[in-house]
Amino acid sequence: MSLDELFTVRSTATANATQIRNLKAIQISIASPENIREWSYGEVKKPETINYRTFKPERDGLFCAKIFGPVKDYECNCGKYKRMKHRGIVCEKCGVEVIASKVRRERMGHIELAAPVAHIWFLKTLPSKIGTLLDMAMADLEKVLYFDSYIVLDPGSTNLTKMQVISEDQYLQVIEHINEESFVVGMGAEAIRGLLEELNLETLRNSLREESQSTKSQTKKKKLTKRLKVVEAFIESGNRPEWMIMEVIPVIPPELRPLVPLDGGRFATSDLNDLYRRVINRNNRLKRLMELGAPEIIIRNEKRMLQEAVDALFDNGRRGRAIAGTNGRPLKSLSDMIKGKQGRFRQNLLGKRVDYSGRSVIVVGPKLKLHQCGLPKKMALELFKPFIYSELEKRGHASTIKSAKKIVEREELVVWDILSDVVREYPILLNRAPTLHRLGIQAFEPLLVEGKAIQLHPLVCAAYNADFDGDQMAVHIPLSVEAQVECRVLMMSTNNILSPANGSPVIVPSQDIVLGLYYMTVERSFEKGEGMVFCAPWEVISAIDNNQVNIHAKIKVRMEDGNIYNTTAGRILVWEGLPKGLKFEYVNCVLTKKNIATLVGNAYRDAGIKATVILCDRLKDIGYEYATRAGITIGVKDLIIPATKKTIIDTATSEVDDIERQYRDGIITRTEKYNKVVDVWTKATQDISSEMTKEISTEVVKDPKTERTEVNQSFNPIFMMSNSGARGNQDQMRQLAGMRGLMAKPSGEIIETPITSNFREGLTVLQYFTSTHGARKGLADTALKTANSGYLTRRLVDVVQDVIVYKNDCGTVDGIEVKQVQDGGEIKQNLSERILGRVLLYPIYHPVTNEIIFPENTLIDEYVVKKLEEIGIASVTIRSALTCQSERGVCALCYGRDLARGHLVNIGETVGIIAAQSIGEPGTQLTMRTFHIGGTASREIERSNFEALHSGRIVLTRVKSVENRDGVHLVIGKSGQLSIVDEQGRERERYSLPNGARLYVKEGQEVTKGTFLAEWDPFNEPFVSEVNGFIKFTDLIDGKTYQEKLDEATHQSSMTIIEYRTTSFRPSISICDAEGQTKQRITSTTPAIYSLPAGAIIMVKDGQEVQAGDIIARKPRETSKTRDIVGGLPRVAELFEVRKPKDMAVVSEIAGIVTYAGESKGKRKLIVTPEIGDPKEYLIPKGKHINVSDGDFVEAGDLLTEGHPELHDILKTRGEKYLAAYLVDEIQEVYRFQGVGIDDKHIEVIVRQMLRKITVTNPGGTTFLVGEQVDKGDFKEENQKIVEEGLEPATAEPLVLGITQASLTTSSFISAASFQETTKVLTEASLKGKMDYLRGLKENVIVGRLIPAGTGYREYMELDIVVPEQKERPNKFLEELEERPVLIEIDS
């Protein structure tokens, strides 16, 4: 690995294959010149590589056999000594040691430089390490190192200072006036080396510490702290500063930079050879010039060229232009070898190509069992070759491997018999790229099939996200017994029924199967056999076989539990095919996709894994059979266009004409017009959609005997496909048979003119053109987003790769409180969904009897959830990864249930990686979502009222209101909230009331479901007068602060406030008494003055009398754009990366009363006044929408304007727990909007990693520095030590890091270097002499051993297995193996 040339990699065990397992840690540090000479087997003196006539390496050249070892095994260069018998002899003629040629991969050489050079990494990696240590600016340092300026080493009697950088001219001026002896200057790396050698680090450390404590300036403190960090790193690591300047350069082994002969007598060479040659040439020339005593200027130039050559070797292109090869391509330097996707880390250490693998196209295998896959015979023959050879020898068909090979090549009959024996019950792995989560690789038992395509079981397609339109999959063969056991026990498709992301079944029938099951379980009136009563299920089957009863007929059956059920014949057919032990209720319904998923989930919980697998296979078989028998197809006639479509469109068109007229007359603004038009069309589209659904979803059935009719659920094929969840949705049906509706522009704005036709009628050219606009954006997005999503996943994996379950219980006393998630009164996620699979922190008491129902540390399973719902618990405090006290990783109780297995998580589980995959995987799914709707604008009709969704009692919080002329209460301000609570006092729904809403209920009023609570104008924001009085205008100047518009039809004029340039005007309306004194508001102590923002329309005249509750002005609300995940994925990344949001909200840092204080510097000024303490003022930019009204009360952390708050602000004002909850909610919001379920705990694991560092505010007696970022665990440990010694402990404040930052500051430098910014990470690590204890997963993969998790968890690895002697007894296990599928359940 090419780190060696740059650093020593000192490992605490020799890197021998057996000892790699026992490796405890790896240390990296700067190589001293002595070290480099010690590694070297000789000095490379000549730039020659090989002799072009003899093809033998040149002596003392870059490929010299004397230094690096022989080219041929056990043969010296001149051919005097050959073969093993001379092993270890050094040939006296050519000086080559007789040894194996592989030493040419490990022996290093060196180059003795004629002049020292600076190591470019320590010079150019920002902040420059050499610069920081000498306290020099980067520019000055470069001038000195590249022989552009002098540096003063000893000022003597001059007025210059030591380490001052002077130009050639200044130097000559000084020399004229002064005797040269006492005055010393230097140039180049030599001078810098001298300065570094002189440094006394201990003294420097002490003086820096004192200075840092005494200084008041923050910038200076920062600078000193930075320098102090570097000084401390050198002292603690034992590295010397002068080692950053090199006298000797290591030469890496020749086999790692090979010279390969091509045909035609030319050679292909590694770029490193060119770079080394350049260094050697310049070095030799410099030596010669120095021996000849050449002029100073020539030597100086040569030294600069040597420095540049070494720079290019280490990091080409870091400084100046990159040195290019013969073809104009920049040469690949040592740094390029290790960094980036093609570098050593990511290309060869983290991702390797493996043998015993193959790939082919996949086709569906409808006859397979869930644990099987079809493997083409040709492929199997190639993959299992060694097994076949050995078996041929064993059975005596071949005596040598060579003859076995021939038999296999001839494909004799015996080969196929042996192949089928070898393959039987041998698990193989199937993988589909991109592998976005762990279900992208699963194990199956192969069945040999003819043809060349791999057959895949249809139910695992969802996990692989595979379809059969030409997808390919790769096959891998696990070789060792351990690998085979892991495949069977952990990776078998039958053991992966639940999704690790949310615990719901991932093996769920889809498409044809769903359609078949739906068709079987639908009922229809007046079918043959309706009303028959059967004594048992077998009787029904017999009746169906004898054609006495139709499968849709409504019948009654006595089931095994003795009850008589109303059901259909088809449902009994399904029931008969299922494994025993499941309740009949699970299938006694119309089996839509949702119901089937519930059935599979219930089966898993009730009957166990084996029964579920059998169930899934039976459902597949029944579903396919009946989908075929039903013969459901699509015809154009099935798309029924509603009769009322024309009327609805005509009504909408006339409404739009009205709105257009109002706009032309100036009654409404452009924004209002746009909003209203879009709203009209949205409503029309929804009306047509519901009309179409009504017509397509029901049909009238006639009894042939009695002529009686009944309305049934429709058997329209398109409706059945959509309703069952097999294919297609409401939106797509609407576009086919209703109207396509509004389309969106690429910017997300909605185009005002909708497409009124549907696909059955066909689109006009113009309509087609309108629809291409949004559709094209969908396609472009897909391409871009896939890459973005993959990058997000990579960052997530990197930040949590070392989060493993380390212990069972960390003993924490802290947790998080969880409630249901609501939005606009709707429950988006109820409490039971959020707490399922978590662990209780506190015991739960019965609200009435006060006895403990569930003790602390109870795992909340389905039973507990049901019980909690019954007794009506509204919020629960659970343990969480966020509050887990484990030093490394998390503990099992804080994590809770392993979602994919349904029991408490095992110790050693890689919960971090699972979390990253669960969040990253849907990202890619979501990216693909946009273009399926084909760019049609999905927009809700603007909401303009609240209706009660539950019965209960009204509770109003912070609601201020005034009564208007009609006796209706109008809400003032935006901080008011309305909730409905039930008898137990649990909150069932909660709404934020908008300013100016008409409130129809009172505090404490009992309401029933459906009661009208409040309504408002969705397009306008009203300004409501709070008192009776007379209007007085201030700063309303025509043409300057407002514009008058005349309405032609009504001859009424309206005044609209315009953007005014000067800040001296503050247009406002005040309400005065008869004497002209401004009156007080009712809701607060401030005067009744209303500032008018730009765009507000005034509804009153100056001097007019108004009453409380009158609307004196209104401001049209902003237009809404369509949301899709394209907004969503960047939003998720923005949150995880802790970036400043684009629409950043202003957050109040304190609690208090808000007052508007006019404007300053073109911004609006808000002042928040607390009860005690100083008020804080906030400047709000003009365009920003303010969320609070004058006189509102705000809490610390409340948003004063619209938009998203910055995460650092939340951390400062509300603390860590609130920030964590906010992050979880915001990220879930994005995924929930797309209908993707991810368990909270996955996001919590990632947020835990973002919050794992803290910033030191006061170091106390510790060695920390002010502003240093420290790991919480290390901080705690250090403080405990300090307290024991009786010194003052350090204090710190919480810190939130973005995932990239968190990955780069991880304790493992190997992991960080393989992530991003490789050179920077390695430079800083080597400077500190860092140790990597190999605790994470990536470090272990890189050093080539098993990951310390799962079966490779260290504590499991160290267990001794003792097998007690047993008496012979019949082996039940083997008998059971005969019944397939083989399933081994492992208990936690």
From Swiss-Prot:
GO biological process terms on file: DNA-templated transcription
Cofactor binding summary note: Binds 1 Mg(2+) ion per subunit. Binds 2 Zn(2+) ions per subunit.
Record-level GO cellular component terms: DNA-directed RNA polymerase complex
Molecular-function GO terms, alphabetical: DNA binding; DNA-directed RNA polymerase activity; magnesium ion binding; zinc ion binding
Cofactor: Mg(2+); Zn(2+)
Binding site for Zn(2+) 1: C76, C78, C91, C94
Disulfide bond sites: none
Catalytic activity: RNA(n) + a ribonucleoside 5'-triphosphate = RNA(n+1) + diphosphate
UniProt superkingdom: Bacteria
Pfam families in alphabetical order: RNA_pol_Rpb1_1, RNA_pol_Rpb1_2, RNA_pol_Rpb1_3, RNA_pol_Rpb1_4, RNA_pol_Rpb1_5
Binding locations of Zn(2+) 2: C810, C884, C891, C894
CDD domains: RNAP_beta'_C, RNAP_beta'_N
Task performed by this protein: DNA-dependent RNA polymerase catalyzes the transcription of DNA into RNA using the four ribonucleoside triphosphates as substrates.
Homology family: Belongs to the RNA polymerase beta' chain family.
Subunit description: The RNAP catalytic core consists of 2 alpha, 1 beta, 1 beta' and 1 omega subunit. When a sigma factor is associated with the core the holoenzyme is formed, which can initiate transcription.
Protein name per its UniProtKB record: DNA-directed RNA polymerase subunit beta'
UniProt source species: Lawsonia intracellularis (strain PHE/MN1-00)
Phylogenetic placement of the source organism: Bacteria, Pseudomonadati, Thermodesulfobacteriota, Desulfovibrionia, Desulfovibrionales
